[in-house]
Amino acid sequence: CCSKSHRMRMSRGQQGIGISAAGMYGQLTTGKPVTIISRTGPRAAAHFFEVQIDTKKNEPLVHENKQIEWEQPQGTQVAIEVEGKYQKGRASVDEWLEQTSIANPHVKLTYHTPEGETKEYPRTYHELPPSPREIKPHPYGIEFGMFLKMLQDTKSHSVSGLLASDFCRVSSQLADEICKAAKVSPHTKPRDLKGSSAETLYRTIQDTKIMAPPTNCLSPIGEKAILSGLYKQIKGEFYTAVSRPPAVYRGNPFVIEAGLAYGAAPQDQNKPRQPAMPKAEGERDEEDSELARVIRYANRVPLLYQQSACSTFKAVLSTTWKNYGVTQSRGALPGGPMVIFVHMASVWVPFTSESKEAIADYDEIQKEITLALRECGRRLGLFLRRRERAASEYRRRNIFELYIEEVVEACNRLKGGTLPKEKLKAQLQKIATSRTGGLKTDEALGKTGAGPEGLPHSIIVTAEGVEGEVDLAARVQA
């Protein structure tokens, strides 16, 4: 999202309207001001403010400004008391914080609920994300009205100077070529360019081949951080994450990231299993009828509403999950215990409305989301096929091992009791292991402690432990 001054840099917010609206709502419902404590560093004093909004003049009213003692070395605390109905479940404050914790595993969150509970979302990823750098707007991402405004507001004294200095990826040579193609003098003053001449220049810019904008204005989450966030909050057997290379839509750079958590948490082998209840004819397991859950993000912020209108959700529906061993009805989400994570990082996220609840359909964005989901699905399919083959081989091995003792005893009787039984038992055990996939079977079932071979940026969880790329700092207990 860009700010109102069109700073081309990825950021969580846009124009500060959200915090202003929250403060206004608190003021209207409770009559109490917003309280702010801020300190810029350990050596600086902490300042306390009480602020309200003058609704007639749209100006802040600072009721109190004083220095106080504060235990925090630096940071800002904002407190707003509002009147509202607290509820849990889907699209609630609780879910928003949970999803925020997944996409920001480098952050520690402490949530004090209105019911008196305290929920901790610990920090599990200890690398801070890179700070995005501001870039100049790309010519492809500017609307005609904004282009006209730039012509009037620029400090450049010529059109070619405007193109070269106010846009990224436009050199002086390319600026002269654009002016020549538009039949506009490069030395024309920008303010003198109006009407059809300005429109011709704008169309020429859009038709000119210009290098894609730089991507250092973005700060994607990263595959390891996504894995850490998913593993922290969601119980499962298999996790994977994909970060796509940077792409461009309408001159705006963006990065699509996807993640996937599949399966239920493995049961502890030491705990006694509950006996399975008999099922009526045609009855299915609950997991078989369960649909996947989609969690969507834009610039690390969860999108909880208007799911069906979002480009992310449409890309999930259009992906053929059956190819990866997952059940899916036509036009529906895939079935089974699965959470699908999709994040879009961009300097300008194309939301469908001002409420910023769903991402608009652009072919370039849809393509990148689909490619990321397919890669996640490919890894999931590989895991499921490998696990099924390994489970089959392991069952065969168990059958062989059931008869090893009897074979050893029979051979010992034939030898008149002089056979070295332990040696023969070890040899037969070795044969049974080699004939049923050997170490590959053990690795696929998580019995060796080795990482998931052939599954980059993935985690496999078994009752024996965890394999793959993950920070084992802390896992939130449900």
Kindly give the residue locations of the regions a language model identified.
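GHKL-type ATPase core
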Residues: C2-G141, R191-D192, S196-L201
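Charged, alpha-helix-enriched surfaces in structured cytosolic catalytic cores
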Residues: R12-S20, G31, P73, Q77, ...
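Structured core elements
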Residues: G18-A21, T35, Q77-E81, T110, ...
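GHKL/Bergerat-fold ATPase module
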Residues: K119-G145, L174-E177, V184-T188, D288-E388
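Extended, structured, electrostatic nucleic-acid-contact surfaces
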Residues: F144-C168, V184-H187
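Helix-hairpin-helix
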Residues: S160-A181, A478
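Charge-rich (often acidic), low-complexity intrinsically disordered regions concentrated
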Residues: D166, L201, A212-W321, A332, ...
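Extended, well-ordered alpha-helical scaffold/bundle regions in very large, multi-domain proteins
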Residues: A175, A182-I221, R374-V407
